[in-house]
Protein backbone atom coordinates (compact mmCIF):
# COMPACT_ATOMS: atom_id res chain seq x y z
CA UNK A 1 0.00 0.00 0.00
CA UNK A 2 2.79 2.41 0.91
CA UNK A 3 4.47 1.72 -2.45
CA UNK A 4 1.23 2.64 -4.26
CA UNK A 5 0.96 5.92 -2.32
CA UNK A 6 4.56 6.84 -3.18
CA UNK A 7 4.03 6.06 -6.88
CA UNK A 8 0.77 8.05 -6.92
CA UNK A 9 2.43 11.05 -5.25
CA UNK A 10 5.34 10.97 -7.70
CA UNK A 11 2.91 10.83 -10.62
CA UNK A 12 0.97 13.82 -9.29
CA UNK A 13 4.15 15.80 -8.72
CA UNK A 14 5.37 15.13 -12.25
CA UNK A 15 2.01 16.21 -13.72
CA UNK A 16 1.93 19.41 -11.69
CA UNK A 17 5.37 20.26 -13.09
CA UNK A 18 3.91 20.50 -16.60
CA UNK A 19 2.17 23.77 -15.72
CA UNK A 20 5.46 25.23 -14.48
CA UNK A 21 6.95 25.14 -17.99
CA UNK A 22 6.53 28.56 -19.56
CA UNK A 23 7.40 29.68 -23.07
CA UNK A 24 7.14 33.26 -24.30
CA UNK A 25 5.08 33.82 -27.44
CA UNK A 26 6.65 34.70 -30.76
CA UNK A 27 4.72 37.60 -32.31
CA UNK A 28 4.53 38.22 -36.06
CA UNK A 29 2.56 41.15 -37.52
CA UNK A 30 1.99 41.24 -41.27
CA UNK A 31 -0.57 42.08 -43.95
CA UNK A 32 -2.18 39.47 -46.17
CA UNK A 33 -1.17 41.34 -49.34
CA UNK A 34 1.64 43.83 -49.99
CA UNK A 35 0.63 47.21 -48.55
CA UNK A 36 -0.84 49.78 -50.92
CA UNK A 37 -2.19 53.05 -49.55
CA UNK A 38 -5.95 53.29 -49.89
CA UNK A 39 -6.36 49.62 -50.87
CA UNK A 40 -8.28 47.33 -48.43
CA UNK A 41 -6.19 44.55 -46.89
CA UNK A 42 -6.06 42.30 -43.81
CA UNK A 43 -3.81 42.89 -40.81
CA UNK A 44 -2.64 39.65 -39.15
CA UNK A 45 -1.03 38.97 -35.80
CA UNK A 46 0.26 35.41 -35.51
CA UNK A 47 1.22 34.46 -31.95
CA UNK A 48 2.98 31.11 -31.56
CA UNK A 49 5.11 28.90 -29.35
CA UNK A 50 3.62 29.99 -26.04
CA UNK A 51 2.75 28.10 -22.86
CA UNK A 52 0.57 28.26 -20.78
CA UNK A 53 -2.42 28.99 -22.98
CA UNK A 54 -3.75 32.08 -21.15
CA UNK A 55 -3.02 35.05 -23.41
CA UNK A 56 -4.49 38.41 -24.43
CA UNK A 57 -3.99 39.73 -27.96
CA UNK A 58 -5.11 43.14 -29.24
CA UNK A 59 -4.67 44.74 -32.64
CA UNK A 60 -3.99 48.46 -32.39
CA UNK A 61 -4.48 51.46 -34.69
CA UNK A 62 -2.50 54.49 -33.55
CA UNK A 63 -2.19 52.92 -30.09
CA UNK A 64 -5.93 52.30 -29.64
CA UNK A 65 -7.57 48.87 -29.59
CA UNK A 66 -9.36 47.88 -32.80
CA UNK A 67 -12.78 46.50 -31.86
CA UNK A 68 -13.74 44.46 -34.94
CA UNK A 69 -11.13 41.72 -34.71
CA UNK A 70 -11.53 38.02 -35.41
CA UNK A 71 -9.30 35.14 -34.37
CA UNK A 72 -8.67 31.47 -34.94
CA UNK A 73 -9.35 28.83 -32.33
CA UNK A 74 -6.56 28.20 -29.84
CA UNK A 75 -4.45 25.34 -31.24
CA UNK A 76 -1.34 23.49 -30.16
CA UNK A 77 1.76 22.22 -31.91
CA UNK A 78 3.56 18.88 -31.61
CA UNK A 79 5.61 20.29 -28.73
CA UNK A 80 2.38 21.24 -26.88
CA UNK A 81 2.99 24.97 -27.29
CA UNK A 82 0.01 27.04 -28.42
CA UNK A 83 -0.67 29.34 -31.37
CA UNK A 84 -3.36 31.79 -32.51
CA UNK A 85 -4.05 34.13 -35.42
CA UNK A 86 -5.82 37.47 -34.86
CA UNK A 87 -6.88 39.45 -37.93
CA UNK A 88 -8.96 42.38 -39.12
CA UNK A 89 -9.72 44.25 -42.31
CA UNK A 90 -7.89 47.55 -42.67
CA UNK A 91 -6.95 50.10 -45.30
CA UNK A 92 -3.35 51.26 -44.90
CA UNK A 93 -2.28 54.85 -45.44
CA UNK A 94 0.79 56.98 -44.71
CA UNK A 95 -0.37 58.41 -41.36
CA UNK A 96 -1.80 55.46 -39.40
CA UNK A 97 0.35 53.05 -37.38
CA UNK A 98 -0.76 49.48 -36.69
CA UNK A 99 0.54 47.05 -34.08
CA UNK A 100 -0.21 43.91 -32.09
CA UNK A 101 -0.12 43.96 -28.28
CA UNK A 102 0.27 40.69 -26.37
CA UNK A 103 -0.09 40.04 -22.65
CA UNK A 104 1.26 36.73 -21.35
CA UNK A 105 2.58 35.46 -18.02
CA UNK A 106 6.10 35.33 -19.52
CA UNK A 107 6.10 39.11 -20.13
CA UNK A 108 6.44 41.51 -17.17
CA UNK A 109 4.44 44.06 -19.19
CA UNK A 110 2.47 43.66 -22.44
CA UNK A 111 4.66 43.45 -25.53
CA UNK A 112 3.76 45.52 -28.61
CA UNK A 113 5.07 44.70 -32.09
CA UNK A 114 4.52 47.27 -34.85
CA UNK A 115 3.43 46.35 -38.35
CA UNK A 116 6.21 46.97 -40.88
CA UNK A 117 4.51 47.77 -44.17
CA UNK A 118 7.60 46.63 -46.10
CA UNK A 119 7.32 43.04 -44.84
From Swiss-Prot:
It holds the Pfam family C1-set. Residues 25-114 form the Ig-like C1-type domain. Residues 1-20 form the signal peptide. It is found in: Secreted. Keywords: Disulfide bond, Immunity, Immunoglobulin domain, MHC I, Secreted, Signal. GO terms for cellular component: extracellular region; MHC class I protein complex. SUPFAM superfamilies: Immunoglobulin. Component of the class I major histocompatibility complex (MHC). Involved in the presentation of peptide antigens to the immune system. Heterodimer of an alpha chain and a beta chain. Beta-2-microglobulin is the beta-chain of major histocompatibility complex class I molecules. This is Beta-2-microglobulin. It comes from Alouatta seniculus.
Amino acid sequence: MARFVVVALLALLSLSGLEAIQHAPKIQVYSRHPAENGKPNFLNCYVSGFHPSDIEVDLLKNGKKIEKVEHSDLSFSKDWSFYLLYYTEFTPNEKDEYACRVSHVTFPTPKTVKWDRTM
